[in-house]
Amino acid sequence: MNVAAGGPGTASASTTAANSIFNNSLLASATGATTMPMAQLADGWLELESDPGLFTLLLEDFGCHDVQVEEVYDLQKPIESPYGFIFLFRWIEERRARRKIVETTAEIFVKDEEAISSIFFAQQVVPNSCATHALLSVLLNCNENNLQLGDTLSRLKVHTKGMSPENKGLAIGNTPELACAHNSHAIPQARRRLERTGAGVASCRFTGEAFHFVSFVPISGQLFELDGLKPYPMNHGGWEDHEDWTDKFRRVMAERLGIATGEQDIRFNLMAVVPDRRIAITHKLKMLRTNQAIVSGTLQKLLKADEQGESGNGDQQRPDTPTTLLEPSAFTAKDLQLLLKNLDTEIAINEQNLADENDRRHMFKVDASRRTHNYDKFICTFLSMLAHQGVLGELVSQHLLPSKKVSGQSAANRISKQNSAASSAGANAGAAAGVTPKSQQQQQQPQTAASKNGKSPGKTPGRRRKGRNKCRKRK
């Protein structure tokens, strides 16, 4: 599913020009890299598809390696420790359901400047950048200590603190590291579409059907909705003491989808930004292997103590040998063996889960290579080789035949094959029974006439003469 961002809420050309000088000087300190105007960034910002693998690799390119993105298929299914949610929906300005949503969300706008500056809320002033905006809205509002943002995002968060939403959007749009990482995951068709339209900052508008990303994140005990095409962030309120913030999010999404689908269907996609599953699995494996070593060592000591007791050498035990775990009241050898077996099973399961996650991450990269590779040269070369060999015209004519004609020919071919098979089967059966088929009798008649003309004896001519004699007697 392609994403087309821009349109309503984008900055005008005059606003962008007025802020270009300020924006370039700002980013020199914000990113620590040589900056350039948006018009000089390679090809501008391109459309991205809504794919969790793409978003995960995009986060890695941003420098954030401890996070992944997962697609959510069931809102009722619990999700472990999400940082935030990204909601992709179809944007149609003229639709009634859209107006209902606007009327509903207008009541929860946060217009206090101090409250807005305390969070990371950036207006989308660059077309096709809503995917990056959605990811940054989740990550830069996360207060988790174990979340490593990386150098680029950390500098961006520090140097844009206290800025207006519009200036934050300009900072995102003119950060070369973000733009290059974003465009590296675009399909070749997106680049060609941008070249045909020549879309700029102010010229890219929503036309027909477009898709847009928004973020839902918990901030200071409140559920916020951050949409770069809205003038203000939206506060959906808090949640109960016995609830998790995801419960509040489920209620908001159920209400949102109920309004949007009241008159016609709406296509949407929901993704969750969560910690990298491999980190938790690796930590669990480390703990399980430590416990496995402890249980295995205790079991060996217990078995050794039993052997020494049976041989009468128990008094030779070293005084410094720990005996706490060897007491009968702790664990028996059978209990330790059962515990060790359970640990082995858990380790095998988690090793398989870790292998699956690594394979999944590898497939993300394979899919990204296939998605971003330009196959135009290969296709042109392949067609040229077919034409050079003289088979291209025949292949094209075969595939251009009407489907009915092809199906009729196929049916005729099937009937002809069935008749041939039936004839051969009948011939074989007749030969086995000593009966000559009718078709073979007709073929043998010329040979019979030839034998008659040659006056060779045969049963058939004798029968014919006998019949003629009977006719003469009747006369």
Curated annotation (Swiss-Prot):
Q: What is its EC number?
A: 3.4.19.12
Q: Which Pfam families match?
A: Peptidase_C12 (PF01088), UCH_C (PF18031)
Query: Compositional bias (Basic residues) at which positions?
Result: 461-475
Give the positions the UniProt entry annotates as the active site.
C130, H212
CC annotations in GO: chromatin; cytoplasm; PR-DUB complex
Site described as Important for enzyme activity, located at D227
Stretches the record annotates as Positively charged C-terminal tail required for binding nucleosomes: 404-475
Low complexity bias spans: 419-460
- What GO biological process terms are annotated to this protein in UniProt? epigenetic regulation of gene expression; heterochromatin formation; protein deubiquitination; specification of segmental identity, abdomen; ubiquitin-dependent protein catabolic process
Region: Disordered, residue numbers: 411-475
Reactions that this protein is recorded to catalyse: Thiol-dependent hydrolysis of ester, thioester, amide, peptide and isopeptide bonds formed by the C-terminal Gly of ubiquitin (a 76-residue protein attached to proteins as an intracellular targeting signal)
A single Gene Ontology molecular function, please? cysteine-type deubiquitinase activity
Q: Where is this site: Transition state stabilizer?
A: Q124
Domain ULD per the UniProt entry, residue ranges: 374-402
* Enzyme class, broadest EC rank: hydrolase
Protein localization: Nucleus
Q: What is its main location?
A: nucleus
Q: Which UniProt keywords apply?
A: Chromatin regulator, Coiled coil, Hydrolase, Nucleus, Protease, Thiol protease, Ubl conjugation pathway
Tell me the function of this protein: Catalytic component of the polycomb repressive deubiquitinase (PR-DUB) complex, a complex that specifically mediates deubiquitination of histone H2A monoubiquitinated at 'Lys-119' (H2AK118ub1). Mediates bisymmetric organization of the PR-DUB complex and is involved in association with nucleosomes to mediate deubiquitination. Does not deubiquitinate monoubiquitinated histone H2B. Required to maintain the transcriptionally repressive state of homeotic genes throughout development. The PR-DUB complex has weak or no activity toward 'Lys-48'- and 'Lys-63'-linked polyubiquitin chains.
Q: PANTHER family per the record?
A: UBIQUITIN CARBOXYL-TERMINAL HYDROLASE, UBIQUITIN CARBOXYL-TERMINAL HYDROLASE BAP1
- Give the multimer and partner information: Catalytic component of the polycomb repressive deubiquitinase (PR-DUB) complex, at least composed of caly/calypso, Asx and sba (MBD5/6 homolog). The PR-DUB complex associates with nucleosomes to mediate deubiquitination of histone H2AK118ub1 substrates; the association requires the positively charged C-terminal tail of caly, probably due to direct binding of DNA. Interacts (via ULD domain) with Asx (via DEUBAD domain); the interaction produces a stable heterodimer with a composite binding site for ubiquitin.
Q: Which family does it belong to?
A: Belongs to the peptidase C12 family. BAP1 subfamily.
Q: What is this protein called?
A: Ubiquitin carboxyl-terminal hydrolase calypso
Q: Which organism is it from?
A: Drosophila persimilis (Fruit fly)
